[in-house]
């Protein structure tokens, strides 16, 4: 009997008995069925010369247990890779891996067909309560138990005819400003400045393109928050580690509506709830819509805050904040929106620079390349005061005192002295 025939026999038995592999008892029954099938094969092997060897049967048993009871051999290989920052699955045999330095096609990992790929996605989603991928919900976004972010879709939403998936993992290798300095993400002087900004309660926006290190930097900044502060974190998909790391910190995670009738819980609502939790500081993981105005309102009422936003530069990020504030439903004009955005004090831009075509590595290391103060507005444009110049380890203080210079001195930022 071929390995595939053995697999089909076990799967038929599981379907026949309606075994629920998401339950502990169901997985125990699957374990027994696998062992019973392999025991029968060993007996058949003793009765005649045809058949697999014991070593092959043992290997097949491990594969069946991985695929039917665990996450599967492919999933285990992917999630165990210490250098992979993102997996991009464009079909059963079109799999790409982003190591941070380059994006390359993987040849050693493949699914047999769409059916096995669907089973892989469903097995991952079994770990996430309330998430499923089917005809009713053909696209999902979910946070896996290890913190990875999974986005997936199936046909017809996936127009290439196959299930597709992206699994983004956070593997910059740093959780503090000191560790980011060791990775040349920023200079020691810039780290000291940002730490002082956090301790002084300044309002900070971290910006950059996709996968530029925004979430990692926001996490590191959060670790600089004084222990006596109460912090509330609001996210569309929980990625920040601060509720686990800070003693007086709680986290909210938005929830989409479900086909079972569960109502959606939006990020805008959660920021409103956060204001009623007696916070000293509110952190919104990323501003992309109506939650922007809710955050700006919290800043205007005296709460310190931080967030991240997509932006090709500090100025572009602030323009996006204005745009998002205008789409929030609040009846305000552009100049009024800019006035709300002026509650932001410091903008930090992260980058993941591309190398020239033909280079061995597609990308240079992630780094901060801009730290500015939002000092006001001229008409419909924000007025920016550059505070640091350079990139990564070469970021240097320009000696320009921001409006909150006195607070920075009290927080111990010495270059202002």
List PLM regions with ranges.
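Conserved lysine of the Walker
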Residues: 214
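Active-site phosphate-binding and catalytic loops of NTP-dependent enzymes
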Residues: 70-79, 124-143, 229, 329-334, ...
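NTP-binding/hydrolysis catalytic cores, primarily Walker-type P-loop NTPases
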Residues: 358-417
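P-loop NTP-binding catalytic core
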Residues: 97-200
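The conserved Walker
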Residues: 198, 209-210
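Hydrophobic positions on the alpha1 helix immediately C-terminal to the Walker A/P-loop
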Residues: 217
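N-terminal accessory targeting/assembly segments
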Residues: 1-133
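Switch/coupling sub-region of P-loop NTPases
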Residues: 202-204, 220-341, 351
């Amino acid at each position: 009997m071929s390995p595939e025939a053995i697999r089909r026999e076990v799967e038929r038995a599981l379907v026949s008995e309606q075994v629920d592999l998401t339950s502990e008892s169901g997985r125990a029954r699957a374990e027994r069925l696998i062992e019973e099938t392999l025991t029968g094969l060993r007996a058949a092997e003793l009765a005649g010369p045809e058949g697999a060897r014991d070593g092959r049967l043992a290997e097949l048993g491990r594969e069946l247990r991985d695929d039917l009871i665990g996450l599967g051999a492919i999933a285990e290989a992917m999630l165990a890779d210490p250098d992979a920052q993102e997996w991009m699955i464009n079909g059963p045999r079109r799999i790409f891996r982003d190591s941070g330095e380059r994006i390359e096609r993987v040849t050693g990992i493949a699914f047999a067909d769409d059916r096995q790929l669907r089973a892989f996605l469903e097995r991952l989603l079994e770990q996430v309560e309330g998430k499923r991928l089917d005809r009713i919900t053909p696209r999902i976004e979910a946070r896996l138990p290890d913190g990875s972010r999974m986005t997936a879709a199936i046909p017809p939403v996936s127009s290439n005819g196959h299930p597709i998936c992206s699994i983004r993992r956070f593997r910059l290798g740093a959780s503090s400003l000191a560790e980011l300095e060791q990775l040349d993400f920023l200079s020691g002087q810039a780290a000291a400045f940002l730490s002082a900004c956090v301790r002084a309660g300044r309002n900070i926006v971290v910006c950059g393109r996709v996968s530029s290190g925004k979430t990692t930097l926001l996490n590191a900044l959060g670790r600089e928050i004084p222990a006596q502060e109460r912090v509330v974190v609001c996210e569309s998909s929980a990625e920040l580690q601060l509720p686990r790391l800070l003693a007086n910190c709680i986290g909210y995670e938005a929830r989409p509506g479900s086909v079972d009738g569960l109502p959606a819980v939006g990020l805008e609502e959660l920021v409103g709830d956060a204001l009623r939790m007696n916070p000293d500081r509110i952190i919104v993981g990323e501003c992309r819509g109506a939650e922007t105005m809710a955050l700006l309102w919290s800043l205007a009422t005296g709460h310190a805050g931080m967030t991240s936003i997509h932006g090709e530069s500090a100025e572009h990020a602030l323009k996006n904040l204005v745009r998002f504030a205008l789409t929030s439903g609040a009846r305000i004009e552009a100049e009024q929106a800019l006035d709300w955005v002026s509650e932001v004090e410091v903008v930090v831009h992260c980058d993941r620079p591309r190398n020239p075509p033909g280079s061995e590595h597609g990308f240079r290391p992630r780094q901060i390349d801009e730290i500015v103060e939002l000092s006001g507005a001229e008409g419909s444009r924000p007025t920016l005061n550059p505070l640091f110049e350079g990139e990564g380890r070469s970021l240097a203080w320009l000696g320009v005192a921001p409006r909150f210079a006195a607070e920075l001195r009290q927080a111990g930022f010495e270059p202002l002295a």
